[in-house]
Amino acid sequence: LGYKQVGSDFPVFLHPDTKEEYALARTERKSGKGHKGFAIDSNQSVSLEDDLKRRDLTINAIARTDNGDLIDPYKGKEDIANRVLRKVSHAFEEDPLRVLRVARLASQLKYLGFSIEEETLKTMKSISQSEELKTLPKERIWQETYKALEGRNPEVYFKELIESEAIYKLVEGNFYFNLKVLEKISSEILEPEQRWAALITNSDCDLDDINRAFGVPKKIQVLCYILGKLIQFNLNLKNAEIKNHEILDLIEELDGLRRNKRFIKILKILDAYNNSVLQLKGTFIPWEALSKQLLSIKPSSSTLKDKEIAEDIRLQRLKIIHQELKRNG
């Protein structure tokens, strides 16, 4: 018939023309630890009801016949009406990834009024108290986290990880997430990478430990580092007289001119952070306008060579910084 199987582990097939996914009814039997520790059974004796019993939540355990009738043995339709995220069966606790999935769904559906049912949250806690969460691949942890950061209420995801105690298995050591910062900033910035940087940079935790625990890609880790440097620099403005060369040195250290687009992206976080959290008064550094001006500088003479060019450009940049600070001071 031309159907192609997606991967080798699950009985999911792509239609040859429409590329729609078609899945055979299946059940899984726990055969090892972690998210992948299952033996799949998709023989002809497996019924649709058997398949639905293995689903995570009742709202995901609903099927529809060709004539439009719903097959809903676990009252998923009722839970949708009541805005409840409820586990289907004891099979829920066999897959540790479901703790993160349900936390993520709670964050994505918060705006519709959904919340996690009490017994389901207890089961999530039970999973968290085992060692199963430690078996999850880092890329799957980040995948769920990234999806949550894309939604309207990313702070709910982390709140549920804390409520379910999952966070204490994922992250070693002491830490504190400032979820109010994430909630405020998420109304101004939409990119998941920026939201993550804003969250952990303002939290009481070791950046390397948190990034490692959540499987954060290197390029996003760099955003966190740069944002942290800029926030600390801005905080120091309250207590110290910043010299022109210190501003230029910082911009150069953070590669703000050569990687200007990345720098601007981080400055957007800083602006939102300043508006909702720091609310700094006094000396103000117009970082974005300043970086664009510094980037446009050319040698003042065509006769300059090598080190002379670098020294000339640096002097011009320091002059621009002095003028901008005077204008905004």
Give the role of each language-model region.
Residues 1-329:
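Catalytic cores of the polymerase beta-like nucleotidyltransferase superfamily
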